[in-house]
From Swiss-Prot:
Tissue: Expressed in roots, shoots, rosette and cauline leaves, stems, flower buds and siliques.
Top-level taxonomic group: Eukaryota
Organism (species): Arabidopsis thaliana
Keywords tagged on the record: Nucleus, Repressor, Transcription, Transcription regulation
Name this protein carries in UniProt: Transcription repressor OFP6
Length: 159
């Protein structure tokens, strides 16, 4: 039973993100790949920003103050990039356009050109979701609804 539990833990470790330090290419993952029996596909390895608890670099933006590079093997890089971006946005409360651009630049600078299309697609879909949610919130606002209905009434009474 203890052996089975130990194997389960090792399996989990090989799948978990491995942080490398301060945005430097990690080499720890190569140890797992060396002992792994399945061959590593070069197109499935990528690095992305991931939040960290501590940082020594002072900066004005949350993204720059708490991030490390993480290398991960993935069967679905799009989904992993999207989840990582959403996690960064929520954990660091990234709401401004400048901070979102910084996040995109971080992902693009840390990853090979091979993954840039996937990164931009994931970022674009997140951007569209945020924009449509903001537009829906404005349309559903009682102040906006009352103002629009009064303007419509005035328009029809005028003609």
């Amino acid at each position: 039973m203890a052996t089975k539990s130990k194997k389960k833990i090792l399996k989990t470790v090989s799948v978990v993100d491995i942080s490398c330090g301060n945005c430097i290419k990690p080499t720890f993952a190569s140890i797992f790949n060396f002992f792994s029996k399945k061959p590593k596909r070069p197109s499935s390895t990528y690095r992305h920003c991931h939040s960290s608890i501590s940082s020594a670099t002072p900066s004005s933006t949350p993204l720059a103050t708490a991030s490390v590079a993480v290398e991960k093997d993935s069967d679905d890089p799009y989904l992993d990039f999207r989840q990582s971006m959403l996690q960064m946005i929520l954990e660091n409360q990234i709401y401004s356009k400048d901070e979102l651009r910084e996040l995109l630049q971080c992902f693009l600078s840390l990853n090979s050109h091979y993954h840039h299309g996937i990164i931009v697609r994931a970022f674009s879909e997140i951007w569209e979701d945020v924009s449509s949610a903001a537009a829906s919130a404005v349309e559903a606002s009682p102040l906006i609804t009352r103002h629009v209905s009064r303007a419509s009434r005035d328009y029809y009474n005028y003609y």
